[in-house]
């Protein structure tokens, strides 16, 4: 009996969402459109420079965004991440549980809850400055293996591979998933993340993963090629199921080496790409745990992603639960 659709593991970060201009990014010297790890002092300097700008708080982190969107679609899940007994940590727990995701990891009595300043420019691109804080101290002892074993999927974010203790937690989750018959889904997270740990990601994809999520840039980084088609073929040769997003071009689905394209849904009012990949993964995981074919799961993933880019921040303001057949037609295979 599977009690949860997905057991998610990732960095627990409070997102601080701030709209800004390209000129500010250029002035500060940040690479647009990617995630950069920074210390508290640097992050504080950015917040000071943007004092007076509108700011919004959300519980976040890549895998957390996926879990929240999964619950919005009607899925069930439990999330593992590390926060501190501080204001941000308490906000994080309450916000996750309000969104419908179980979050029961005991908070640390030391350090500070991690934060991610998300700078959104008028073209809807997001640039993330992340101070991991206590989230980087997540260990294998924080995993509730009993909950993992009664989940259909474990879902692990690639960003966790940047720390020794979080890496150890990832490996244990994957190993225990395989033992318990729980399918392993892994997201590559970021092309820079892939480049930092390419050999490890290759090994994980080949030996542990039942399903990988990536975008075209991440796929090219793993395959060491400039061709997204060749990259997808390569990853498909080492993992049974691959979901590769390609921006407004929708997604490519590979099952046992057979590749198909699933068109995207038009976004009428593109505001912010924060969480688009995370929400795509949520839609796919919802579909796969509710009887959808891989192609129809990707269709639902594309729809959820098309809705999130019309919002500021990685949180849907519309409830999608129970609307799958209305939106997709007969979505079940």
Which sequence ranges carry the predicted segments?
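Conserved phosphate-binding/catalytic region of the ribokinase-like
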Residues: 1-13, 19, 26-37, 176-179, ...
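Glycine-rich phosphate/adenosyl-contacting loop at the front of the ribokinase-like
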Residues: 1-80, 91
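Alpha-helix C-terminal capping segments
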Residues: 67-76, 118-121, 287-290
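Hydrophobic beta-strand scaffold residues
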Residues: 77, 103, 184-185, 242
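A glycine-rich helix N-cap at a beta->alpha junction
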Residues: 95-112
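Conserved phosphate-binding/catalytic loop of the ribokinase/pfkB sugar-kinase fold
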Residues: 104-108, 118-164
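Conserved beta-alpha-beta core of the PfkB/ribokinase-like small-molecule kinase fold
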Residues: 153-233, 249-251
């Amino acid at each position: 009996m599977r009690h949860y659709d997905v057991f998610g593991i990732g960095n627990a970060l409070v997102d601080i969402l701030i709209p800004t201009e390209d000129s500010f990014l250029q002035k500060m010297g940040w690479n647009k459109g990617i995630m950069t790890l920074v210390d508290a002092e640097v992050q504080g300097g950015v917040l000071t420079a943007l004092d007076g700008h509108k700011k919004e708080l959300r519980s976040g982190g890549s895998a957390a965004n996926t879990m929240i969107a999964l619950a919005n679609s009607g899925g069930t899940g439990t999330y593992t991440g590390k926060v501190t007994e501080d204001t941000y940590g308490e906000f994080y727990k309450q916000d996750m549980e309000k969104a419908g995701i179980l979050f029961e990891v005991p908070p640390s009595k030391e350090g500070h809850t991690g934060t991610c300043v998300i700078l959104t420019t008028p073209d809807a691109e997001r640039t993330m400055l992340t101070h991991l804080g206590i989230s980087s101290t997540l260990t294998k002892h924080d995993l509730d293996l009993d909950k993992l074993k009664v989940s259909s999927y474990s879902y692990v974010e690639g960003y966790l591979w940047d720390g020794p203790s979080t890496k150890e937690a990832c490996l244990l989750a994957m190993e225990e998933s395989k033992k318990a018959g729980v399918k392993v889904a892994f997201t590559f997270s970021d092309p820079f993340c892939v480049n930092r740990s390419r050999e490890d990601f290759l090994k994980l994809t080949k030996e542990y993963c039942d399903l990988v999520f990536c975008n075209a840039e991440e796929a090219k980084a793993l395959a060491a090629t400039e061709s997204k088609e060749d990259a997808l073929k390569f990853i498909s040769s080492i993992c049974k199921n691959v979901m590769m997003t390609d921006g407004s071009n929708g997604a490519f689905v590979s099952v046992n080496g057979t590749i198909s394209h699933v068109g995207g849904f038009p976004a009428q009012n593109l505001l912010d790409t924060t969480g688009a990949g995370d929400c795509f993964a949520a839609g796919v995981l919802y579909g796969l745990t509710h009887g959808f074919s891989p192609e129809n799961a990707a269709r639902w993933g594309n729809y959820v992603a098309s809705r999130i880019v019309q919002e500021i921040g990685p949180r849907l303001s519309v409830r999608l639960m129970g609307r799958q057949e209305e939106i997709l037609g007969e979505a079940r295979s």
